[in-house]
């Protein structure tokens, strides 16, 4: 019973999904502590908000408050190995231990869950939907997979709204713990084959997820996916996409750094919506978020205002410099289909500019499974700088490195492989028009220094 526990201990406290739960338990007045492998801006924020976090794998650092097994809940992320010393201590001593996804499922079961699932697009779409609800007369609680730029957090709380917006993560089948009232499914391009084994098993996981949507609710699925939904009786199915489906956009106008669209629903049309983050892919993300909002009573005017005031998500098309001569942004894209969408959206905005990307592959298994697809997507760029693979939870795989991607890039593309720490020196000598940092690893830690370098160079040239 989550209400009666007094302390919560997190093994892997710095993950984006874990941090939303930490903030939730802090808001409930619980004593919160945990371990993470490395300090980050996120863990420092959590400490400032009241959590106790340490960075050594050491049982003696677990606070006494968290050693009372009758009053302590232990939450861990699948990225943490079972032999981790602290996790092993809790297992050996009979503590109640749950995965993050199980705890999230328990917390949200009593509310109307508005979930967003899919290989990619789910963080932006769920954050956009949360903003549409939060700024409307309805409100919402939200557990997000990224930091909302509107609110500076990945957790929104409402004491009155029946709705909870949830990013539904398919990794480790986490989303099977949820009980959605409604769900968007954005994409089902195979991923996490280290967990699923085959593309068919990955699709089957999404099919099972559709069976969890509650009668009276709805599935809003992107038109054209390979997935065959298997919903319960009483669950409506709607389709959406950029250009067709029950929900779609018309009269799309892109120019002068702005995007305007008309939103078309089965029973309404909202004209002249301005996208607060004017990137091509946000047309489709926006259609899904607006569909969720419209079906649950957010008014047309509130939708229009919310789309215009949406400021985006950290590390998702996150512009750091935007001038006539120089553009620099970072984007979390780490799957081949996602990278292709990112590059096409950037190309749409900057047709005549040279586009350079620094890409850090994320996971050895993903690189092994998709290196040719990564090369195809990155070949849409003018120049590619590859860094070493970010391992996250994995051990190296013999023969798997960034060189696999490098060797399969299209002939004629400018390309190099560079150590992370050498990137600033490399960029100092390069003419840059549009630069994008791609990936879900720790390359983002270098973004502030790259920003300073490019700003200094721009100032010295002006």
Residue ranges with predicted function:
Residues 49, 236, 375-433:
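C-terminal helical cap/extension that packs against the catalytic core
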Residues 24-30, 47, 61-66, 78-221, ...:
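Phosphate-binding loop of NTP-binding sites
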Residues 1-115, 128-130, 244, 248, ...:
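Short, basic phosphate-binding NTP loop
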Residues 30-37, 219-223, 356-359, 381-391:
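Short internal beta-strands
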Residues 70-71, 422-453:
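A glycine-rich beta-strand to alpha-helix segment
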Residues 95, 201, 209-216, 341-350, ...:
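P-loop/Walker A phosphate-binding loop and immediately adjacent motor/lid segment at beta-alpha junctions
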Residues 2-7, 17, 24, 28, ...:
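Nucleotide phosphate-binding/pyrophosphate-handling subdomain across enzymes
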């Amino acid at each position: 019973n989550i209400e009666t526990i007094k302390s919560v201990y997190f093994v892997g406290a710095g993950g984006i999904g874990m941090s939303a739960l930490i903030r939730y338990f802090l808001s409930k007045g619980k004593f919160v502590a945990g371990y993470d492998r490395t300090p980050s801006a996120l863990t420092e924020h959590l400490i400032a908000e009241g959590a106790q976090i340490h960075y050594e794998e050491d049982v003696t650092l677990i606070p006494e408050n968290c050693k009372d097994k009758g009053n302590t809940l232990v939450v861990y992320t699948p990225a943490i190995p079972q032999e981790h010393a602290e996790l092993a201590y809790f297992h050996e001593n009979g503590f109640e231990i749950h995965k993050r996804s199980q705890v999230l499922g328990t917390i949200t079961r009593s509310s109307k869950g508005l979930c967003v699932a899919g290989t990619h697009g789910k963080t932006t779409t769920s954050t956009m939907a949360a903003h549409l609800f939060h700024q409307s007369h309805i409100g919402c609680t939200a557990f997000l997979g990224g930091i909302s730029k509107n609110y500076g957090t990945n957790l929104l709380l409402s004491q009155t709204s029946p709705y909870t917006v949830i990013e539904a993560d398919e990794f480790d089948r986490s989303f099977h713990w949820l009980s959605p009232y409604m769900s968007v499914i954005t994409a089902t391009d195979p991923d996490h084959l280290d967990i699923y084994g085959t593309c068919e098993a990955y699709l089957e996981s999404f099919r099972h997820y559709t069976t969890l949507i509650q009668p009276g609710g709805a599935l809003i699925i992107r038109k054209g996916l390979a997935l065959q939904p298997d919903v319960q009786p009483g669950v409506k199915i709607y389709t959406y996409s950029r250009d067709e489906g029950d929900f779609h956009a018309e009269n799309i106008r892109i120019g002068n750094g702005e995007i305007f669209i008309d939103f078309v629903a089965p029973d309404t049309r909202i004209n002249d919506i301005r996208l607060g983050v004017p990137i091509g892919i946000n047309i489709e993300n926006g259609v899904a978020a607006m569909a969720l909002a419209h079906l649950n009573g957010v008014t047309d005017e509130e939708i229009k205002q919310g789309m215009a005031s949406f400021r985006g998500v950290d590390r998702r098309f996150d512009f750091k410099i935007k001038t006539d001569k120089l553009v620099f942004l970072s984007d979390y894209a780490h799957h081949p289909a996602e990278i292709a969408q990112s590059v096409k959206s950037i190309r749409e905005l900057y047709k005549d500019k040279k586009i350079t990307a620094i890409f850090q592959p994320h996971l050895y298994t993903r690189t092994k499974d998709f290196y040719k697809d990564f090369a195809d997507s990155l070949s849409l760029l003018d120049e590619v700088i590859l860094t070493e693979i970010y391992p996250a939870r994995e051990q190296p795989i013999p023969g798997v490195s960034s060189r696999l991607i490098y060797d399969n890039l299209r002939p004629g593309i400018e390309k190099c492989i560079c150590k992370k720490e050498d990137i600033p020196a490399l960029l100092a000598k390069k003419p840059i028009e549009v630069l994008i940092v791609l990936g879900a690893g720790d390359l983002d830690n270098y973004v502030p220094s790259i920003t300073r370098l490019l700003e200094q160079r721009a100032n010295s040239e002006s």
